Amino acid sequence: KILFITFHKKDDENQPNFYRFTDYLGDLTLHGFRELYGEDVIDFPGSWHLYKDEAEKRKINKDIIWGRGFTYTNILDNFDNINREDIKNKIKSNYFELIVYGSIRRSDLFLDIAVNSKSKIIFIDGHDDTYIEKKFLKHGLYFKREYFETTKNVEPINLSVPKSKILKSIDIKPIHLVAPLIPGKSKTYIYKNEEDYYKMYQKSIFGITYKKTGWDCMRHYEILMNGCLPLFLDIENCPDLTMKNLPK
């Protein structure tokens, strides 16, 4: 069994069941674990916005969720099939072979218990900065997204996309030389649904992308998965250990 500790931050008091701040890396890594290990992966407290049934039940408002939820919401099924009961005691009794902290700098729930168990521990840090929380390194393997300097017990990690989202065949008659969406130009952020957003890249030869706060970004992968070529500005300045698995 694998325990995946997720991060949630409550929005305003009028929407107590909605979590505005998600974590792309944590959410998509959870999806990858579930693809590999199925319901042996227990997400706690539970990333409900990833589940089609639960997101519909809670009437998720995509207008106030990061990136309108494109690519990373509604990618799992059967939220209630996962047994999330008595997690604390299960950690104490070494029920889990592995405990993954999906966003360690936002949530270290049960860590005081986990470090005294026999479970292996993985920490994931998807923040945009290059800071590493070194106090965790003695307890497990630390995966850092914006990674620039070799550090003991730290490994690089990339963002990802669900395989089901990858375009099966490329449009051989694209309309645009360069995709209309220009990162940082708010007036080009006109896409209200995932389908139209994807079609914009599918109908384009190149998609402009570049470093904003951090080097790694969902946009790079959304361009690629829709059969479009990333026109990545200043890619030569990207640290070797950041986006290590992305051809650059």
What residues fall within each predicted segment?
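Nucleotide-sugar donor-binding catalytic core of glycosyltransferases
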Residues: 1-247
